[in-house]
Each structure stands twice: as C-alpha cells, then as structure tokens.
C-alpha cells in the first residue's frame, strides 16, 4: 500500500504497523503557502468552495495520488490510521496554515461534518484540566431529565 508520492515521505510508524506516517516536505509546503493564503479562516467557515479549493491544491501537488492513498489507508483493516504533518515546521507555517492543511486533508477523505458545538467545519480544541461549560454532554454525572411537554 505504501507508495512513493513526490513531496511526501511515507512510511510505517515506528510504534505500530497500523499507523502510516506521512511527512510533507518543505518544497511542497512552500508550494501550498500561496494557494492557502488566498483564503482566510472566515472564508473556510462560510464558503464551501474555498474548502474544496484548498483540498484540490493539496491533491494537485501529488498528481491526485494523495486523496487515493488516504482513502486506501482508512479503508484497509490492516492500517486504518495515518499521521500527516510537515516534516519540519518552517517559519511560514502558523496555526492558520495548519487549520487549512487539516481542512484540506479532511476534504480529500470525504465530505466533513459540521461541528455544531464549535460552529465550524473544522475543530480546534484547547485541552485543559477543567471545563466550565454547562453542557450536559460534558457532565456524565448529572442526570438528564426527559421532558414530556413537547
């Protein structure tokens, strides 16, 4: 399954043969900066075509091989998981670039779902020890009552 795609270093993870590590080379990252910078994060949120466009930019740089590989990995019961990331964090890569990259990867796999809690098509999680929200979903110890008033 592991094939060679120019601009990517693809190998089996050292800890588990079920995980495929995909490193994105600096040269390819530099080619992504211009098409990714055409759109800001707000455009990604509200304009579906922008999400498609950045996904296409990523896939075009791999001659449409990356989307095929990612889907094969996820559908293969012997693997089912991949880690894709820049090989090196170059100075032009920031959090917004990484959100755009993950959005592009998600769209290469399939149509992503809308995250209603975050209100976005992508998710950014800040991991903290405490959660002060009032959501019942995050408080398993609170009884949920069923209402019969319609």
State the predicted function of each range.
Residues 1-150:
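Fe(II)/2-oxoglutarate oxygenase catalytic core
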